[in-house]
Each structure stands twice: as structure tokens, then as C-alpha cells.
Amino acid sequence: VPIYVSAGFGFTSDPQPPAIPHDNNPVGSYRRTFELPAEWEGQRVFLHFGAVNSAMYVWVNGQKVGYSQDAKLPAEFDVTSHVRPGENTLAVEVYRWSDGSYLEDQDFWRLSGIERDVYLYAVPQVRLRDFYFKQDLSVDFSTADYEVVMDLRNHLGKEERGGAELQLLYGQEVVSSQN
């Protein structure tokens, strides 16, 4: 059992990982409606939670979307197949303790619930999800080689062709360009 602080775990004096107390595990229930813009139809829709402590189940329009646990990291769910234009209902069940609570035994207030922003966002079916830029500078910093790795996502179920252009700027001047 990891022990990070001199204080014991907040939920038991006799820890038995990964067991959590079922008779003393408060649950917070959250429910609200939201409007999905009609112009989001045909796009991927994601539900983002900035942080929820300690574990949660999520439902959209009565359908279970998923589960997440980690007190300080974001969680995202692809809710495209669960939402519709117009009014939708979001329900979240937050558990105070989870088996992850053993790893999160840090010196902080032991409060539970939704701790950061919750929002929806829409993206195209084919998109650049992320990229990584790696550079290798010469010893005198006068030249550099670089590599760009792109994470492309295609949710259409069929092959799509496209292109990307990369421009490296120095002020307003294009010093390198690649297709």
C-alpha cells in the first residue's frame, strides 16, 4: 500500500487495496439539460470534464456513455451517437472513493465532485487531432532539422484524401515550407 503522507487514507484505518468502502462512499448526482446546436449535425461531438474527484459514470439521454476515475486529470467521451440537435440530458454520478484513491493519497483537501469545467465541443469527421514538432539544433544554433508527426482521425469509415501544408515562420518571413 503506498503511503505518501503521515496521515492515513481518508476512508479507512485498515486499507485493503483495491477494496473500497461500500458502506461509506458518498455519491453526488448531477443532472442538467443542454441544447445541441443544429449546425453540429454531421460532426463528432465530445463531452469534456476538466477534473472529477474521484470516479464518475456518465449518461447522455439515458444511455451510459462511460466511466472515468482520476481526481486531477481530464476525461473525454465521444457522445456523437448519444446526442441529437435540440435539448439533451446529461447525468453524472460521482463517487467519493475509488480504487484510484489509494494512489491519490496526497496532502490535499479530500473533497469530491466536479472540480473543473465541463463542456461540449464539435470537430469534423476527418481532422488533425494533434501534432508533435521535434527539432534538432546544430551545435552553433545556426541550422536545425525538424520533424512533424501528425495524428489524423477519420471517422467516416472510408478513405479520404487530403493534404497539409507546414510553414515555419521567423517573424513574418516564411523560412521553410513543406506540403
Task: Identify the function of each model-found stretch.
Residues V1-S6:
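Predominantly extracellular/luminal regions of secreted and cell-surface proteins
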Residues A7-H22:
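Surface-exposed, low-complexity/disordered Ser/Thr/Gly/Pro/Asn-rich loops and linkers
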Residues I20-D130, N154-L156, Y170-E173:
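Accessory beta-strand-rich segments of carbohydrate-active enzymes
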Residues A71, D140-A144:
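Ser/Thr- and Asn-enriched, surface-exposed coil loops between beta-strands
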Residues F133-V139:
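Short beta-strand segments of immunoglobulin-like
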Residues T143-N179:
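Beta-strand-rich binding/interaction modules
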